[in-house]
Structures are given as C-alpha cells and as structure tokens.
Amino acid sequence: MDIFRILSRGAALKRSSNSDPGVKSESQNATKDKQNSLLRQVEKETDFFNTRKHTEVTKDIEDEAQDEAVPPPKITTEEDAAKLRKQNKVNVSGTDIPLPIGSFEDLIARCNLNRKLLANLIASGYSEPTAIQCEAIPASAEGRDLIACAPTGSGKTLAYLIPMAQALISSPKTKNYGIRGVVIAPTNELAIQIYQTLAPMCRGSNLNVTLLSKQVASKISSSIISANKFDVLICTPLRLIDLVKKEQVDLSKVEHLVIDEADKLFDHGFVEQTDEILSHCTLPTRRTSMFSATIPSGVEEMANSIMKDQIRIIVGHKEGASTSIDQKLVFTGNEEGKLLAIRQMVQQGEFKPPIIIFLQSIPRAKALFHELIYDKLNVEVIHAERTPKQREEAIRRFKNGDAWVLITTDVLARGVDFKGVNLVINYDVPQTSQAYVHRIGRTGRGGKEGKAVTFFTKEDKLAIKPVLNVMKQSGCHEGYSEWMESMEKLTKKEKQQIKQHEIKRKKISTVPQVVSKKRKQRKEMIEASKRRKEETK
C-alpha cells in the first residue's frame, strides 16, 4: 500500500465532503495557499526513511492528488461480509452490524481516518488488518459497545486503539479538558505494552496519552501535574482507584472505556475494582469495549448488564487457542520426572530458545530458577515478589536475547507480547482452560508457528481435562495419548474444586546435583576421619 498516494487522496476526500465540486467559493480560494503549505508539511512529516526529496508541491501534482478518487471499500455487500467472516472463522451477533473492512485503506473512505494516524500505523509496520481488527474497528468507529473474543496474538490491542484514537483526534477539546479515554489492564506489564503501542500511533497528533505508572501517579497525587492534561490514561485498576478516591482523577468525562483481558478483570479479586471504576465513568454517551482471548458465560452476562446495543464478536472458538500452536501433553510420572523431562529436551535439541516456563506458585518458580541456573541454562525469573524495576529488567533481557528462558507464574500469562517465542512449557498444569489459553498464547503470535508442552503427573488427572478440551478444539489430536479420548468432561463441582484449591506438589529440589555430590563426599570424609580417630584411641 502506497502511503503517500493515500495521504494525498485524503485531501480530495475532505474537499468533496465540504463543498460543491463545481463551484469555488471565496473561502476556498483564500485558503488555497494554506492547503499547499499543509500538503508540503505532510510530505516532510511522512518521509520516514529520508528517501524522498522535500521539493515544492507543484500544481500538476496537487491537481492529480485532488482529482484522484479514493478507491471503494473492498467489502461493500452483506455477501462480501459473509464470505470474509467464513474465511476468518468469525461469528458476529447484534443489531444493525456494520460491514467489516477488507484493508486499512478502507478506513479512509468509511471512517475518514486521520492521515497522521494512518501514516503512523504504516510506519509502525502494520499493513493488513487481522480478523478481529476487520470487525472491531468499524463497529467501534460507529460508536457501538463491543464484547470481543479472539485468540492471543491476533491483534486485539490495535482493534480497540485505532477507533479510540481516531474518535478523540477528530473531535479535539480545549486544553486541560480532562480524561476522555481509559484503558484498564490487569497487570503492569500489559499496561506498559498497550502504552508502547498507542504512543507511536498518536505521534504528531493533538492527543496526549500516558501510562499511569508509579511515578506519574505520584506526581498527580502531589499535584505536581494535573490529570486533566491527559486525554488517554492506560492503567491497572488499583492505581486508578486510589487517585479517584483522592479526587485527583475525574472520570466523568470518559468517552471511551476499554477493559482488556475482561475475563480476568471480572473475576474474583478484580471484579470489585472494575465495578468501582465503572461507577465513576458516568458520561451517558460513554462507549465501552471488552476484549479477551477467553470470555466465560458469567463474564459475558456481567458485560451485557453494563452495555447498550452491543455487538458480540467471536474469532474462532470462544475459549480456543490459536491453531498456529502445536500443543502436547507429556506424562512425567512425578515431580522429579518434570526436571528429567526438561533435561531430556535439552539433550535432544527440543529446548529451542526463547522459551517461557509457567509454574503455579512463586516458591516453585524460585526453586526451578535456581535448579536451571545450576544446570548452566541462561534463565530469568518474574513473579509478584519482584519489584517493577526487576521485572522490567528481566523482560528487557529476555526480549534482547540476553536471557534464553523466562520462568514465571501466571502474572505474565496475559497480553504481554514477546516476538518469536518458540516454546511455552507448562511445568504445572493450569487450573482453568482460560489460564491455559492465555499461557500458551505467549507463542504462535501474529500467525507464526509455536509449540506448547504441558507436563502432568498422576495428581493432575482432573486438571488436564480442560487442557485436553482446548487441544481438541484446536485440532491438536496428535498431542495426547489415544486413551485420553475417552476421558469425560469435568463436572461443575470438579471445576470449582480445581479452581479454588491448588494441587499440593512436592518441593522442587533446589540443591544442584554437583552441590549434592560435594556435600555427600564431604560427609563421607568427615565420617571416615571420625572412624580413624576412634581406631587410634
């Protein structure tokens, strides 16, 4: 797609929408020089790679840009839409559903997409919309509430950021008007990633976005800066609630509210915080969007209670994993067998970095970290007991390739995008199918292939059933033994039992084999010395 041709077309679109093409008004003639100046400025600002000379925009080029019409959208009929949805395995429900888009270029004609926003998208490497973006962007652009479910790594973040940014940029307010957009995420790591996606998109626009980090929250709390200077706030729930209760953040003007990882934010431990935020977002015309890779029926019921005239978008299965992930269940017998399985994978060349390993608790994550350190593997660890700075440093080292393996708990299972993760290992079986989908979603992102291996022991006979169901839905029938085909689904009581009670597991040995051997040798030497002393008496 030629960004420079598209940006030129934008001028023609604006002119035709505001005037009669057959009549030139005095105001048009008076502003012609100004338009030429703006076109020259756009030429300069969109020369991202310094390959284009900033020359004078001649009359011939201007006339060509003005006369060239924007091509019609790729999707123009319900038949086109049905064909695209079938191809992308998308199910959309609701009333008066907008047609999907077939390309980002369609947004120029259908939504009058801001030229600077489009230029920034192209500069960031986005070329064609994904399945969720094709549906969610036009629906959001028309001001509809959304419940959207799509596999991990399918581009959900961009699906809600583009329409929010477009809406806010195209209707600017006075300086220090107040917060107009809020994106809530369950973890700090995910909030950082969302900010890092939005900030480059809004570069050069009138939109002021910020991440509500500890430092920013402290400055707002101390009245060093005013929260009203920001248009969009990206945050975790508790930090926002703290400032709202102190009356230092006003959410009454929020026009766009996005709840990312909605299943987590409406689960126990978060639902009260989410409700608190919703109660302060009082603007009657507020648009609410909820996105996640898994949306259980209970969460959907709560979502329906706070939305109006919403559209429901499901890409693939409602609780399914990406089909680009090769999933496998490995029986290890016992806890010791898990360590042996990892060492065997290393010996057989299956342990190909970058790799993420998930465990069920912080003590177990620490223990495995020390075990693999003494196995001379290049590893890092992230869990809730580490400081934000330590966690950021661990993520930085992993992304840069300084660490090959990242050991973590479910704190890192949601939303965080790591490019090119080859393998995810579930050292401990997750407690729910949702947790499993989010964990393995760290690989196979953006359509790339990935691999996920889940270790299980005889204690996991119930816990592996939800994992097995996800594997069947994803078509990974070769990843488990034939006898598992006949396993019955969990009862409601069994699901609650697994979710509420962690499986008690034996402690992972943190004593490396070499240290254990030296200790044994020393003990034998001491005992031999004692015997010699006894014999000489």
UniProtKB/Swiss-Prot annotation:
InterPro entries: DDX52/Rok1_DEADc, DEAD/DEAH_box_helicase_dom, DEAD_box_RNA_helicase, Helicase_ATP-bd, Helicase_C-like, P-loop_NTPase, RNA-helicase_DEAD-box_CS. It is found in: Nucleus, Nucleolus. Residues 137-313 form the Helicase ATP-binding domain. A motif (Q motif) lies at residues 106-134. Residues 324-488 form the Helicase C-terminal domain. One of its GO terms (biological process) is maturation of SSU-rRNA. Keywords: ATP-binding, Helicase, Hydrolase, Nucleotide-binding, Nucleus, Ribosome biogenesis, RNA-binding, rRNA processing. The Q motif is unique to and characteristic of the DEAD box family of RNA helicases and controls ATP binding and hydrolysis. Belongs to the DEAD box helicase family. DDX52/ROK1 subfamily. This is ATP-dependent RNA helicase ROK1. It comes from Meyerozyma guilliermondii (strain ATCC 6260 / CBS 566 / DSM 6381 / JCM 1539 / NBRC 10279 / NRRL Y-324) (Yeast).
